[in-house]
């Protein structure tokens, strides 16, 4: 069965998997990729991309309201046709998943549709057939986490998968979880016309990001009409008289037409198959080294399945690294400077340490904090986007970047520059000396660096 034998087999066609398959093929490998659902994984089909189409629609509604201020229109009244919103989302998803399929075909990758799992150290079972490979890359991805409370299986409780297919707008939407997905979808459904409430068990939103960013985002969401409740735990979901209620530990009760459960994701280890006790795991995640090797040397694990950083852009690099090593290379993934973005309205983006982390490592006296508000940036003002700021955390002794945090309209695009500079080991002082285009949002980063150095031009003198 020579046609069933490959140099590299990849289980899972998400960001890590399809990149791994393409890279291995580029290096001359005979490659097979198994996908049980649709190419592109959670990111393209049920996560990153679909949510951004919803957010673009929400941004357009926001722009219509702002157009009154700019003298473009007189009547800002809007209504949302959810069927068309979903159809647009589906169109974008089809374009991208179709593009992934075309890329795989152009590189000669064999794609097998079906659920695959290891049946031996060099064997994969799929659809009643057995495939063999010299090296195997596991890219099983992750699944939405469910919290064990009474009523969690109520039909009105949705994950991000189901809510992105809603054809009718809920009047009252309660989001359990104030992380990335929860905040992003809150910023979509509120402009659509839903009354949105976010309930977060910890003391702040986006708990893994800089505390000041979290506080700024909370304040902004509340200002936009979103009800934000932190340090509140849901104890039960119950249907009463045809309505759905969430009961909270503090004794309060929330009514909802739909409930979005957004409390994180857990790894999907089903692809381990008969090797589930052979391949080393810890806390439900496959253990890998920096080259993505598992405890079985010719088997690799990339993306969410290893739990290192559950981000699509890290999955891309992990998949590429695993593929190069599967083809005989010696590559590692450096996760020192990975940007994180929340596509809320306004956006949030970070790279490096949070302020709390930097203080814990170096002490408050060793640091200088530079900040520059978009309200003092000409480009932001002319675009009607004055909200937010750039924050630079500097280790004073070496003028070294510890972290950069951005809250504002273009944060996700702007974070690439500080990420590149930190990877290149450029200093805050050197960045403050760089000429940035004027007028541009990116000037705010340069000015924040200048503020950290004590020489920001476009802020009043500190006394």
Please give the residue ranges for each predicted region.
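Flexible, glycine-rich terminal cap/loop adjacent to redox cofactors
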Residues: 9-13, 25-37, 42, 49, ...
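Glycine-/small-residue-rich beta->alpha transition segments that form the dinucleotide
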Residues: 133-135, 139-145, 256-269, 305
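Glycine-rich flavin
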Residues: 2-6, 22-29, 34-169, 197, ...
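Beta1/beta-strand and adjacent pyrophosphate-binding region of the FAD-binding site
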Residues: 2-14, 169-179
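N-terminal Rossmann-fold NAD(P) dinucleotide-binding loop
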Residues: 17, 182-183
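A structural signal for the hydrophobic beta-strands that form the central parallel beta-sheet
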Residues: 111, 138, 159, 228-230, ...
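Gly/Ala-rich phosphate-binding loop of Rossmann-like dinucleotide-binding domains
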Residues: 21, 25, 186, 190-191
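Short FAD-binding loop at a beta-strand-to-alpha-helix junction that anchors the flavin cofactor
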Residues: 290-309, 398
């Amino acid at each position: 069965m020579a046609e069933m034998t490959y140099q590299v087999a990849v289980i899972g066609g998400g960001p890590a998997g399809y990149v791994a398959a393409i890279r291995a093929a580029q290096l001359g490998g005979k490659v097979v990729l198994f996908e049980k659902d649709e190419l592109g994984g959670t990111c393209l089909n049920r996560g990153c991309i679909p949510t951004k189409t919803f957010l673009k629609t929400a941004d357009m509604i926001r722009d219509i309201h702002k157009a009154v201020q700019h003298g473009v229109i007189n009547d800002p009244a809007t209504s949302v046709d959810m069927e068309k919103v979903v159809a647009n989302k589906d169109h974008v998803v089809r374009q991208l998943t179709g593009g992934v399929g075309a890329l795989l075909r152009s590189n000669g990758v064999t794609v097998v549709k079906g659920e695959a799992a290891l049946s031996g150290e060099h064997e994969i079972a799929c659809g009643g057939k057995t495939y063999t490979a010299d090296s195997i890359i596991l890219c099983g991805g992750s699944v939405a986490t469910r919290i064990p409370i009474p009523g969690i299986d109520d039909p009105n409780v949705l994950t991000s998968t189901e809510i992105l297919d809603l054809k009718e707008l809920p009047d009252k939407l309660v989001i359990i979880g104030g992380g990335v997905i929860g905040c992003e979808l809150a910023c979509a459904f509120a402009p659509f016309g839903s009354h949105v409430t976010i309930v977060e068990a910890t003391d702040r939103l986006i708990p893994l990001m800089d505390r000041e960013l979290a506080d700024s985002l909370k304040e902004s969401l509340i200002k936009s009409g979103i009800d934000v409740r932190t340090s509140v735990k849901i104890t039960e979901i119950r249907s009463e008289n045809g309505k759905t209620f969430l009961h909270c530990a503090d004794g309060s009760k929330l009514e909802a037409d739909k409930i979005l459960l957004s409390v994180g994701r857990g790894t999907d280890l089903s692809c381990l198959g008969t090797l589930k006790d052979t391949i080393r795991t810890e806390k439900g995640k496959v253990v890998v080294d920096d080259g993505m090797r598992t405890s079985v040397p010719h088997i690799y694990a990339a993306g969410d399945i290893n739990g290192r950083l559950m981000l699509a852009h890290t999955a891309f690099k992990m998949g590429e690294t695993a593929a190069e090593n599967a083809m005989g290379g010696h590559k590692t993934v450096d996760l020192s400077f990975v940007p994180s973005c929340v596509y809320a309205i306004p956006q949030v983006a970070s790279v490096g340490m949070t302020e709390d982390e930097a203080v814990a490592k170096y002490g408050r006296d060793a640091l200088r904090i530079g900040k520059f508000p978009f309200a003092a940036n000409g480009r932001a003002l002319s675009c009607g986007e004055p909200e937010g700021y750039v924050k630079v955390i500097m280790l004073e002794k070496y003028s070294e970047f510890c972290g950069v945090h951005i809250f504002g309209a273009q944060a996700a695009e702007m974070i690439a520059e500080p990420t590149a500079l930190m990877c290149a080991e450029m200093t805050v002082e050197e960045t403050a000396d760089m000429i940035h285009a004027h007028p541009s949002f990116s000037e705010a980063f340069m000015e924040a660096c200048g503020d950290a150095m004590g020489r920001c031009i476009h802020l009043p003198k500190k006394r």
